Amino acid sequence: MLRLDTRFLPGFPEALSRHGPLLEEARRRLLAKRGEPGSMLGWMDLPEDTETLREVRRYREANPWVEDFVLIGIGGSALGPKALEAAFNESGVRFHYLDHVEPEPILRLLRTLDPRKTLVNAVSKSGSTAETLAGLAVFLKWLKAHLGEDWRRHLVVTTDPKEGPLRAFAEREGLKAFAIPKEVGGRFSALSPVGLLPLAFAGADLDALLMGARKANETALAPLEESLPLKTALLLHLHRHLPVHVFMVYSERLSHLPSWFVQLHDESLGKVDRQGQRVGTTAVPALGPKDQHAQVQLFREGPLDKLLALVIPEAPLEDVEIPEVEGLEAASYLFGKTLFQLLKAEAEATYEALAEAGQRVYALFLPEVSPYAVGWLMQHLMWQTAFLGELWEVNAFDQPGVELGKVLTRKRLAG
C-alpha cells in the first residue's frame, strides 16, 4: 500500500483532527461539481474506462510490426506517458518523444528511424498545440516521402473526441484517432489514451496500473483518517507559507515522474485566487540518490523555505548483491549488501538528515515500483492537487497564465 510517513512533523495527527471540517468541506465542494459540464473532473473516472482499454489493446494487437514509437506532444501530452513508459517498458519497442521543437535532435532522429517500422502518435487535447502541429507536419512529410500512400498506417492521433484541427485532420484522412474525454485536461490525462496507448506498445500491465488508480480513488473518498490525498493536501496547505515544494523520488525507473508532478502542481495551483491574490508554491523536481550529490547541499544548509516530499520504494522487484573486491577494502561496508539496501539506506538517511537540518519533510513509501503502486501514486497526486485547488480557492483545471505567450508567439511568426 501507499504509506504516508510524518515522523518528523510532530503534531500532524492533531492538525488533521483540528482541520477536519475544512478538509471535509473542500472534498464536498469538489465532488459537488462532478458530472457538471466544464468541471474537468473526468480524470476521476478514467480507471473504470474498460472500453478504452479494450480499444487500445485491439490497436496494439493489430500493429505488431512497430519497433519505434514516436510520440509528438508537449506538456501533459508527453510527461505522463514518458514517466510511465520509462518505468515499465517490457516490450523492446523504442520510444522517442518530440516534446520540443529544436531542429537538430529532430533531424538526428529522422536520420536514424526506419519509417517502415515506425509508428507516429500525435497527441494534443485541443488539437491546436503549435509544437505538436509543427512536429506532425515534419513527420508527415517524412512518412509520405518514404511510404507513399501507406503513410496512414504509420500515424495515429490522440485528441478531443469531436473538435479541433487534429480531429478534423484525422477524419479527413481516415486516420485512427483515440479520444481524450472532454472533461479530462492534459495534465490529468496520463491514464487516458494519452498514456494507455504508448504503454500498450511498451508491454506494460495496464490492468494493474488502473487497479492502483482505483485504489487511489477509494482512499480519496474514504473517511478523513483513512483519506491519504486529504492528508497530503493538508500537509501542503499547512506549509503554504513555504514557497518551495521539493518532490524527490528514489527510483531511477521513475526518473521522469518529478517532471510530471511539477506540471501537475505548478500549472494547477499557481493562480490568482477568488480574492484576487496570487497563490501557489513552486514544485522542484529531484531524484535520489543523484541529487544527494547536487541539490541536497542546498536542501540541508540553504534557506528553510521548503516542504520536501520523498517518494521511497520499500522493496525491489529484483536485486543484486554487491560482491567483495580485493583491493577495495575501503568499500567493505558494502560487500555482501545489495544495491537496494544501499538505495534504501541512502533514502532513509537523507530523510533524517533533512529533518535534522530543520527542513519540513515527509515521505510517501511505495511497496515497490510496480504498475499498481505507481498507478495509485499518480492518481493520488491528482486527487491531492484537486483538493488543494479547493483549499486555496483556485480553479485547478485551467491555465489562463499561458495564453498570452501563445498569442505573442503567433504574432511574432505572423510578423
From Swiss-Prot:
CDD domains registered for this protein in UniProt: SIS_PGI_1, SIS_PGI_2
Pathway the protein contributes to: Carbohydrate biosynthesis; gluconeogenesis; Carbohydrate degradation; glycolysis; D-glyceraldehyde 3-phosphate and glycerone phosphate from D-glucose: step 2/4
Gene3D superfamilies: Glucose-6-phosphate isomerase like protein, domain 1
GO molecular function terms attached to this record: carbohydrate derivative binding; glucose-6-phosphate isomerase activity; monosaccharide binding
Catalysed reactions, as listed in the record: alpha-D-glucose 6-phosphate = beta-D-fructose 6-phosphate
Places the protein is found: Cytoplasm
Broad EC category: isomerase
Highest taxon of source: Bacteria
GO cellular component, one term: cytosol
Residue numbers annotated as active site: E267, H293, K406
Biological processes annotated in GO: gluconeogenesis; glucose 6-phosphate metabolic process; glycolytic process
Keyword field: Cytoplasm, Gluconeogenesis, Glycolysis, Isomerase
EC number(s) reported in the record: 5.3.1.9
InterPro entries in UniProt: G6P_Isomerase, Phosphoglucose_isomerase_CS, SIS_dom_sf, SIS_PGI_1, SIS_PGI_2
Pfam families xref list: PGI
PROSITE patterns in UniProt: P_GLUCOSE_ISOMERASE_2, P_GLUCOSE_ISOMERASE_3
HAMAP family (UniProt xref): G6P_isomerase
Similarity comment text for this entry: Belongs to the GPI family.
Job description of the protein: Catalyzes the reversible isomerization of glucose-6-phosphate to fructose-6-phosphate.
Name of protein: Glucose-6-phosphate isomerase
Lineage of source species: Bacteria, Thermotogati, Deinococcota, Deinococci, Thermales
